[in-house]
């Protein structure tokens, strides 16, 4: 998987960073792209990236503040003008449906593809498909806001070809079934269990993407044992009180969350305009005092997960 940040600024765009949006490339057979938030000018950012609108089949909205949704109507229409008929599903808090339908109705816009809008009212399971189980958890912000947890299925271990050869099991179409851990009957009548020829299964990855939030116990629960957490760090820690009063987090608070959740990796984003690119190393340094494996995202940066 790869995660590309299209916008990493908080609140309003700056000369160096656009407002929030990121795209997860599942790198699967379906070539699916999942977008998280869609701030103003996200589609313009896409023009400068490798992201293809037609491949985006899910959009997850964390909350209804403008810097996270004002890019949606234009993006939906541009996706349609590209001629795609691929279905699109949008998940978001209550109100996202009215926002989208009002924008499309008043502008008399027509979409060439099926659009399904699913409103979220509480924590819990969302769906399981494409080898991923998705769930959400409520955060602490002035408006309803959610974080999303994606848990990848475990993958079968590698097939032990040497053991198969030692036991005189010839290569054939049954290898594919053995790799899946299934039981097969060989041409000579022998029945073998694929699980006996596989190494330990490969644990699936867990990725948690937060919306805006101040520290809250539910965030720790949502991020528990995650391989990667994407979390806002609007201000340096000397402005933690100001951050919290607006429903946001500081650098150190984001790092503390990752540590409490026993996460493996933290990527911070949603940086205030008061910090120039030259100052971002200072934000990262603060995180490193608490959680060493922290990175800071910039626009158009892609992280391998």
Swiss-Prot record:
Binding residue positions for Zn(2+) 1: 63, 65, 141, 212
One Pfam family named in its UniProt record: Lactamase_B_2
Location of the active site: 67
Gene Ontology MF: a single term: zinc ion binding
Source lineage: Bacteria, Pseudomonadati, Pseudomonadota, Gammaproteobacteria, Enterobacterales
Cofactor-binding details, from the entry: Binds 2 Zn(2+) ions.
Gene: rbn
Domain of life: Bacteria
NCBIfam families for the chain: PRK00055.1-1, PRK00055.1-3, RNase_Z
Disulfide bridge partners, by residue number: none
Protein name per its UniProtKB record: Ribonuclease BN
Cofactors demanded by this protein: Zn(2+)
Source organism of this protein record: Proteus mirabilis (strain HI4320)
């Amino acid at each position: 998987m790869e995660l590309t940040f299209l916008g990493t600024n908080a609140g309003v765009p700056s000369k160096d960073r656009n407002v929030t949006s990121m795209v997860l490339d599942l790198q699967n057979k379906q070539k699916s792209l999942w977008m998280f938030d869609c701030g103003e000018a996200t589609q313009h950012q896409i023009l400068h990236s490798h992201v293809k609108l037609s491949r985006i089949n899910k959009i997850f909205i964390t909350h209804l503040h403008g810097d996270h949704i004002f890019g949606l109507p234009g993006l939906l229409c541009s996706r349609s003008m590209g001629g795609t008929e691929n279905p699109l599903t949008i998940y978001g808090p209550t109100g996202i449906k009215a926002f989208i339908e009002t924008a499309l109705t008043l502008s008399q816009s027509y979409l060439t593809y099926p659009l399904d809008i699913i409103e979220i009212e509480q924590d819990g399971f969302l769906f399981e498909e494409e080898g991923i189980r998705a769930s959400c958890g409520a955060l602490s912000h002035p408006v309803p806001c959610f974080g999303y947890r994606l848990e990848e299925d475990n993958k079968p271990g590698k097939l032990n070809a040497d053991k198969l050869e030692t036991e005189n099991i010839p290569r054939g179409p049954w290898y594919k079934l053995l790799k899946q851990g299934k039981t097969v009957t060989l041409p000579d009548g022998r029945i073998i269990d694929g699980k006996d020829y596989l190494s330990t299964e490969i644990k699936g990855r867990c990725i948690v993407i937060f919306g805006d939030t101040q520290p809250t116990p539910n965030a720790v629960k949502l991020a528990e044992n995650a391989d990667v957490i994407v979390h806002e760090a609007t201000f340096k820690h000397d402005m933690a009180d100001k951050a919290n009063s607006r429903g946001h987090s500081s650098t150190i608070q984001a790092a503390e969350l990752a540590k409490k959740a026993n996460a493996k990796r933290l990527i911070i984003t949603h940086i205030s305009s008061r910090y120039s690119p030259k100052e971002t190393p200072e934000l990262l340094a603060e995180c490193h005092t608490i959680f060493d494996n922290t990175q800071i995202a910039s626009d158009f940066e892609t992280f391998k997960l």
